[in-house]
Amino acid sequence: SFPQIYFNNGGDKLKITNISQWGSIAWTSFDSAFYGASNLTLTAVDTPTLTGVTSLRRMFQGATSLTTNAAMNTWDTSTISNMSEVFLGATVFNQNIGAWDTGAVTTMLSMFQSATIFNQNI
């Protein structure tokens, strides 16, 4: 199985430039997944299977080129309890995520810190 991506601001983080498809993987965590992937964009029209995920902490932290599409708004985030620093430093991120279910979230500490152009209703 391949349940987790974990760059955590290291490794080949600069080589990942696009996510074009999430596939049918049953993910278990996105904690620090694309942290530091400053060349990353997201064009996938499918959605990641997040039913086994409780943390998106630092998922896109420092992803300074992060642009996405409308599919991100349809992610099922009902099992997520930690959204801390998800978009911290994602300076060009400005995607609508108003449909995200945050009912289970217990912390959103610094979720949008330094996401300087983010201006969406949430």
Where are these regions (language model features)?
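Negatively charged
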Residues: 1-122
